[in-house]
């Protein structure tokens, strides 16, 4: 009898939720990566509108917290919905939603609470910010997770819409009337995503095929995917010249970033290219690209106001 109590205690400890489990459920890395564009959108709105940074801190912090919650909630709901296919893919079989360490009911409750509280915070800033945040939730959960991910080869492109929402949320929190610069941030993030996610999909093409997810590399193959990646990278080339408000230095530096990615994309057409190695190089470059691009926006905008 005593041994049974001990065994139950051990199992309880083993199943206790850890911070690592929470990170996996809400996809913390993805959330953190999207906070940089959200902050950059808000910062550029502050600088271009002539508002004081200090007076904008309440809206800025509320926006960042609300955005964190709606993204975390959306990702948790994605984990809830994708349990069946995640259990098939080796890279995702250790997720708490798959192992059973966290019940499906708990994941669903967590996701709904996070999204509701996050939306409430965004609506306290202004109506526009709340609506844009809701569009992000709808796009990721409904248009991507439920509708396109399992049925359309264009799922990555459709998923790029909600993925490009963060800078708009940030900008609207400070200036509800979105400027052309705000929309360009949206366009750039939209264009950036296919090449980024196709690179990862090349490495996991067999997994996606096993799970029946029609990702481009799994359906059309490597040669077709690298053409698509080159196309999307090329679309980035003119974008800096639509952001003249940020100055010549920014346009030059952003163009250098774009050209570097273009050269890397072209290198994928070599006859002796190692597909997975090239894809991961593209993936890493895309991550650095996004971080450098938005940090550069903040720095350049700050310098202009000094």
UniProtKB/Swiss-Prot annotation:
Catalyzed reactions: heme b + (2E,6E)-farnesyl diphosphate + H2O = Fe(II)-heme o + diphosphate
Q: Which UniProt keywords apply?
A: Cell membrane, Heme biosynthesis, Membrane, Transferase, Transmembrane, Transmembrane helix
Any one GO MF term held by the record is: protoheme IX farnesyltransferase activity
Q: Does the keyword Phosphoprotein apply?
A: no
Q: Name one Pfam family in it.
A: UbiA
Membrane as UniProt keyword:
yes
Transmembrane residue ranges: 28-48, 53-73, 105-125, 127-147, 156-176, 182-202, 227-244, 246-266, 283-303
Would you tell me the Gene Ontology cellular component terms?
A: plasma membrane
Membrane topology label: Multi-pass membrane protein
Q: What is its EC number?
A: 2.5.1.141
What biological process terms from GO does the record include? heme O biosynthetic process
- Top EC group: transferase
Q: Give the pathway annotation.
A: Porphyrin-containing compound metabolism; heme O biosynthesis; heme O from protoheme: step 1/1
- Intracellular or extracellular location(s): Cell membrane
Q: What is its main location?
A: membrane
Q: Which CDD domains match?
A: PT_UbiA_Cox10
* Extra remark: Carbon 2 of the heme B porphyrin ring is defined according to the Fischer nomenclature.
Give the function comment from the record.
Answer: Converts heme B (protoheme IX) to heme O by substitution of the vinyl group on carbon 2 of heme B porphyrin ring with a hydroxyethyl farnesyl side group.
* Family note: Belongs to the UbiA prenyltransferase family. Protoheme IX farnesyltransferase subfamily.
Self-association and partners: Interacts with CtaA.
| Protein name stated in the entry | Protoheme IX farnesyltransferase
Species assigned in the record = Macrococcus caseolyticus (strain JCSC5402) (Macrococcoides caseolyticum)
Give the classification, highest ranks. Answer: Bacteria, Bacillati, Bacillota, Bacilli, Bacillales
Q: Which gene encodes it?
A: ctaB
